[in-house]
């Protein structure tokens, strides 16, 4: 049997209003690409992965962690499938808003509620509550005088502080500002609080998430 190239796997899902840059974040982080004025042609559930190194606080060792990052986009039928299957069992959730779009910030509460109403803990996803991380994208446009819907960044910071949700509000996927930091911070938070079983132990768990996580359970490598 081939040796695994990672010790743990974390599932992370991207959610937020349309046009906030979720798909571009996925491409920037996993592929190092950003297409100026690009058109999102893919409709459905897009999954990319990346292996990073994190510190295991309990053993003080550096471990390799494979991030499986899920992004749902497209029409209503894809969104319903996404909500039904991909908000239920994940290790972490990145909720994005656009700092130039006040409505996308105002909708953060709706996204938080949707996730909390869908999330279920399990052997593979041990956190009793969903682990959330809020991201404000397009900070490169914050000084653009042509944009009249800029979010006062004090408000999202106060909002996140009131809910004890970690966040980064000065992100630019276009300019590659704080992109890596998002995933590094969220992944480390998961590993420090409710880490999943090691990959080598997953197959030893019997009857894991029976009936509720058929899609995610098949992705264990």
From Swiss-Prot:
Q: Which Gene3D superfamilies match?
A: P-loop containing nucleotide triphosphate hydrolases
Q: Where is this motif: Effector region?
A: 38-47
Q: Which Pfam families match?
A: Ras
Membrane topology of the entry: Lipid-anchor
Q: Which residues bind GTP?
A: 16-23, 71-75, 137-140
Report keywords, A-Z.
Answer: Cell membrane, GTP-binding, Lipoprotein, Membrane, Methylation, Nucleotide-binding, Prenylation
Annotated GO CC locations: contractile vacuolar membrane; endomembrane system; Golgi membrane; plasma membrane
What is the similarity comment for this entry?
A: Belongs to the small GTPase superfamily. Rab family.
Listed name of the protein: Ras-related protein RabS
Q: Which organism is it from?
A: Dictyostelium discoideum (Social amoeba)
Q: What is the lineage of its organism?
A: Eukaryota, Amoebozoa, Evosea, Eumycetozoa, Dictyostelia
What's the name of its gene? Answer: rabS
